[in-house]
């Protein structure tokens, strides 16, 4: 089973796998561990990753990048509206209202959903992993920003399904970093000791995330998270782009923003300049040849001036740091270390701001680029039964408070309740109790829209169906289980109706006197049982933490509810009936459409494969033309007649011209047939050359074998001691085989020496190899027969002398022993061992 972690970044992606030796980040076909999050659409196929990145300028309108933040967002979303101006490609409103990406693919206009585009990238990463692992990749853990909402998370989950992946967990990026940090630490405090608090700062290309985590041995608990969803490396790039657009506009009278290709070129150069300034404080040049209208442009920038222009961005670094400490109720002195990851944390001013806030040196023990994917791979290994991993419990948090709202006819309106507070432990389940006579709807939403980086606070609506009153007409007790799962997605996972079957001793039904009051109320399980359980959990139990949280929470609630005071105990028999739930999720893709996307992705993968095979076949023809043309005037020259060489050379030239004219775009089979046609002419020449290279070596080896056996025959005839044990009849066989081999070799050598090199050889290398094997199989076993061993003479008296006294020493045997003689001697070894042989 494969164990894969995927860091799905805004600008670039990484894939890591768990192997016997640990976690390894995989390199792609370009030997680069970083794969650009980029897809380019062409008339025949798609290019994904590094191949697509090279087409960003040449195929700007059909090359898609920066699409990660469109997940689960409507076309009318303010964020999408703001992003439009930064995109070289077109985005459109889909029939569902979501954001679509418009490109020209296979010579026709196509609209793709964000899920489809992300699935294309995931398919490429999957292919990269499979090429290294040499086996199928299905199970994986994928990273998402910690600030993603339900709709965005479900959108990414749909993308993994379209790509044919089974996502075991959507893991928050900061949590993945914390896992990569903590699982290898050997000096963490014990479970009963005060935890070690570590802050993780992740500033990538598009966003800025901070989390504070508490570590104990074998345990990681996220305490709080904070973020700035738009502060990242690209904001610093934009500062440079805007500066040079203004400067070049004045200096060269160019309107750069009117030409998307010019703007893309400038953006690429500014990103390079930004990275250079991180390591160099002096003035650095920026030069672009033939930038616009055949005009060469140039400018300079230094770190000091750049930081002045970025003052407003740098001011946004501190608030999330302060927020995360306030949420976790920690002081700066409580922080053990501050670990930084992400490409933008390499900017010296950013590091300085973070270090100054905490008043301590920053820690850089993790790989800034690969920490997230390594954490995801570790989580996948923990979840996989195929790997034995050190026990490590992971408790994440709910980033936003979640509430439920339901209709309350008795109160002529609606009621609501906050079921998960901000920074509540996750994964987690709660059981809510309602009293209802008919089906009802629960509406889930985020309680604090002002904290949400998303325009719509709604999560979903859940219709609990088939709710009926009790047989006496009273309200039924309905237990509803709500859950935030390992992906951070909220759901009403189950609902059940408690049906009263029988009342004994003519007593009133339990809770009947309260039914009128509780008609439209609900009960929420308290969270204390979970907290107690967390303290009592052993590391072994922590591995199944999410399930234990849910089970114990529900069980403890039932225990409380079902154990009223003994004096008022009502003897009732009840049964539980599961109720169907109809989900109406925000921006959810329906199953039928998802299957269609899966089918389309399969077709596109096949089209890419066919295109690659066609290109490989075409390249093989071109490669063969160049190879044979060079060798015909080189090492193959004396193995082909002049007429044949001239005609073959002409054929090669015709093929080369055909490749760039009529044969430029042909089906794969045409190239395969063309290559076979050329090889029919070239293969005999190649064979003659190879035979001429191998034949002398093999004849030499055969001659050595014959010479060796002739020496043995001569030694045997001279009756040398070394071979005097060999049988004369066998040696006659050796002599006969050796003479025959010598005669065969001399005959073939004479014939071959008379043969021209431009025709096929008289004898081939494989025939000589067969003759060598034949000779060795006959002669080898005979001459290598070992001499028989000569047994040394036995010393018969030795044992007898050692059995009795030596030189008169030792006790004499008694009279009885003397009379018995050897019949009463000490039992022999075989006699001693005999009883043991009877024991099973």
UniProtKB/Swiss-Prot annotation:
Record family assignment: Belongs to the heat shock protein 70 family.
Region (Disordered): 506-575, 782-840
Positions of modified residues (N6-methyllysine): 773
One GO CC term, this protein: nucleus
GO biological process, one term: protein folding
Phosphothreonine: modified positions: 538
Name of a matching Pfam family: HSP70
Domain of life according to the entry: Eukaryota
Phosphotyrosine modification, residue list: 89, 336, 660
Biased composition (Basic and acidic residues): 514-533, 788-799, 829-840
InterPro entries: ATPase_NBD, Heat_shock_70_CS, HSP70_C_sf, HSP70_peptide-bd_sf, Hsp_70_fam, HSPA4_NBD
Transmembrane segments: none
Name of protein: Heat shock 70 kDa protein 4
Species of origin: Canis lupus familiaris (Dog)
List of residues that carry Phosphoserine: 76, 393, 415, 546, 647, 756
Assembly and interaction partners: Interacts with TJP1/ZO-1.
Entry's localization field: Cytoplasm
GO MF terms held by the record: adenyl-nucleotide exchange factor activity; ATP binding; ATP-dependent protein folding chaperone
List of residues that carry N6-acetyllysine: 53, 430, 679
Designated gene of the protein: HSPA4
Keywords: Acetylation, ATP-binding, Cytoplasm, Methylation, Nucleotide-binding, Phosphoprotein, Stress response
């Amino acid at each position: 089973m494969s164990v894969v972690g995927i860091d799905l970044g805004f600008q670039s992606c990484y894939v890591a796998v768990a192997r016997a030796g640990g976690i390894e980040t995989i390199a792609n076909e370009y030997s680069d561990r970083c794969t650009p999050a980029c897809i380019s659409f062409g008339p025949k196929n798609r290019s994904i990753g590094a191949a697509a990145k090279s087409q960003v300028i040449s195929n700007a309108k059909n090359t898609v990048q920066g699409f990660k933040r469109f997940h689960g967002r409507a076309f009318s979303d303010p964020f999408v509206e703001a992003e439009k101006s930064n995109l070289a490609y077109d985005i459109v409103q889909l029939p569902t209202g979501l954001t679509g990406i418009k490109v020209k693919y296979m010579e026709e206009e196509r609209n793709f959903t964000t899920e489809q585009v992300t699935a294309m990238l995931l398919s490429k990463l999957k292919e990269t992993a499979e090429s290294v692992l040499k086996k199928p990749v299905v199970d994986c853990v994928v990273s998402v920003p910690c600030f993603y909402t339900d709709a965005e998370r479900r959108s990414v989950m749909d993308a993994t399904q379209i790509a044919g992946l089974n996502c075991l967990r959507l893991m928050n990026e900061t949590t993945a970093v914390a896992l990569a940090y903590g699982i290898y630490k050997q000096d963490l405090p014990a479970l009963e000791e005060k935890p070690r608090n570590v802050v993780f700062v992740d500033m990538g290309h598009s966003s800025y995330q901070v989390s504070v985590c508490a570590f104990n041995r074998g345990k990681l608990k996220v305490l709080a998270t904070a973020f700035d969803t738009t502060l990242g490396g690209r904001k610093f790039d934009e500062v440079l782009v805007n500066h040079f657009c203004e400067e070049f506009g004045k200096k060269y009278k160019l309107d750069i923003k009117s030409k998307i290709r010019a703007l893309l070129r400038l953006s690429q150069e500014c990103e390079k300049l930004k990275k250079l300034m991180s390591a160099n404080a002096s003035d650095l040049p920026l030069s672009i040849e033939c930038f616009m209208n055949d005009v060469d442009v140039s400018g300079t920038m230094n770190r000091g001036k750049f930081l002045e222009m970025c003052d407003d961005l740098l001011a946004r670094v501190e608030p999330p740091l302060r927020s995360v400490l306030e949420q976790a109720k920690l002081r700066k002195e409580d922080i053990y270390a501050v670990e930084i990851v992400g490409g933008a944390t390499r900017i010296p001013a950013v590091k300085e701001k973070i270090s100054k806030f905490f008043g301590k040196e920053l820690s850089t023990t993790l790989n800034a680029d690969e920490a997230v994917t390594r954490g995801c791979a570790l989580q996948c290994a923990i979840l996989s039964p195929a790997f034995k991993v050190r026990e490590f419990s992971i408790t994440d948090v709910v980033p936003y408070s979640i509430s439920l709202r339901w209709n309350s006819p008795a109160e002529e309106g609606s009621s609501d309740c906050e079921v998960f507070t901000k920074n509540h432990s996750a994964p987690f389940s709660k059981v809510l109790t309602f009293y209802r006579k008919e089906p009802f709807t629960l509406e889930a939403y985020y309680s604090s829209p002002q904290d949400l980086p998303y325009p719509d606070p709604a999560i979903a609506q859940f219709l609990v169906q088939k709710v009926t009153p009790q047989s006496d007409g009273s309200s039924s007790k309905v237990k509803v289980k709500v859950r935030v799962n390992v992906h951070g997605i909220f759901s009403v996972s189950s609902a059940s109706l408690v049906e009263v079957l029988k009342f004994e001793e003519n007593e009133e039904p339990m809770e009947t006197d309260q039914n009128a009051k509780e008609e439209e109320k609900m009960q929420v399980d308290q969270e204390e049982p979970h907290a107690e359980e967390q303290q009592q959990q052993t590391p072994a139990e922590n591995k199944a933490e999410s399930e234990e949280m849910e089970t114990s929470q529900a069980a403890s609630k039932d225990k409380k509810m079902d154990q009223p005071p003994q004096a008022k105990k009502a003897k009732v028999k009840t049964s539980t009936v599961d109720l169907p739930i109809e989900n109406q999720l925000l921006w959810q893709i329906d199953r039928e459409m998802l299957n269609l996307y899966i089918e389309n992705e399969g077709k596109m993968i096949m089209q890419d494969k066919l295109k690659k095979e066609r290109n490989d076949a075409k390249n093989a023809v071109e490669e063969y033309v160049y190879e044979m043309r060079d060798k015909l005037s080189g090492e193959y020259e004396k193995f082909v007649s002049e007429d044949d060489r001239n005609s073959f050379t002409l054929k090669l030239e015709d093929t080369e011209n055909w490749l760039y004219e009529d044969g430029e775009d042909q089906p794969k089979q045409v190239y395969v047939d063309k290559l076979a046609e050329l090889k029919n002419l070239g293969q005999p020449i190649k064979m003659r050359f190879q035979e001429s290279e191998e034949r002398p070596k093999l004849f030499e080896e055969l001659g050595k074998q014959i010479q060796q056996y002739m020496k043995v025959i001569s030694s045997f005839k001279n009756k040398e001691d070394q071979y005097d044990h060999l049988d004369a009849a066998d040696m006659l066989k050796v002599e006969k085989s050796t003479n025959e081999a010598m005669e065969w070799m001399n005959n073939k050598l004479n014939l071959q020496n008379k043969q021209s090199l431009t025709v096929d050889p008289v004898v081939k290398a494989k025939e000589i190899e067969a003759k060598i094997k034949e000779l060795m199989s006959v002669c080898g076993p005979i001459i290598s027969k070992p001499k028989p061993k000569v047994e040394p003479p036995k010393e018969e008296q030795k044992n007898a002398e050692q059995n009795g006294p030596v030189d008169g020493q030792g006790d004499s045997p008694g009279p009885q022993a003397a009379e018995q003689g050897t019949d009463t001697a000490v039992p022999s070894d075989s006699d001693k061992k005999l009883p043991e042989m009877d024991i099973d």
